[in-house]
C-alpha cells in the first residue's frame, strides 16, 4: 500500500438535531444529522412524522410539478 495517501482517521462527534451526541470514528471531526436512534420513530416506537415536506417542495420546484 502507498503511504500518506489516506485521510486521517480521527475520533468524531455526531450531533443530532434532537440534542443527542455520541462519538465514533471518521475522517471528519464533526458530523451533524437530522435524526438518530434516540429520536427516530422506528427506535422510539412513537408515531412522530419525520419532516420531508421541504424535500418534496424542493423536488416539485426543481422539476416544475404543481
Swiss-Prot record:
Zn(2+) binds at residues 16, 18, 36, 39. Pfam families: Ribosomal_L31. Gene3D superfamilies: Ribosomal protein L31. The keyword RNA-binding applies. GO terms for biological process: translation. Keywords: Metal-binding, Ribonucleoprotein, Ribosomal protein, RNA-binding, rRNA-binding, Zinc. It comes from the Bacteria. Its cofactor is Zn(2+). InterPro entries: Ribosomal_bL28/bL31-like_sf, Ribosomal_bL31, Ribosomal_bL31_A, Ribosomal_bL31_sf. PROSITE patterns: RIBOSOMAL_L31. One of its GO terms (cellular component) is ribonucleoprotein complex. Binds 1 zinc ion per subunit. GO terms for molecular function: metal ion binding; rRNA binding; structural constituent of ribosome. NCBIfam families: L31, PRK00019.1, PRK00528.1. Part of the 50S ribosomal subunit. Belongs to the bacterial ribosomal protein bL31 family. Type A subfamily. Binds the 23S rRNA. This is Large ribosomal subunit protein bL31. It comes from Campylobacter hominis (strain ATCC BAA-381 / DSM 21671 / CCUG 45161 / LMG 19568 / NCTC 13146 / CH001A).
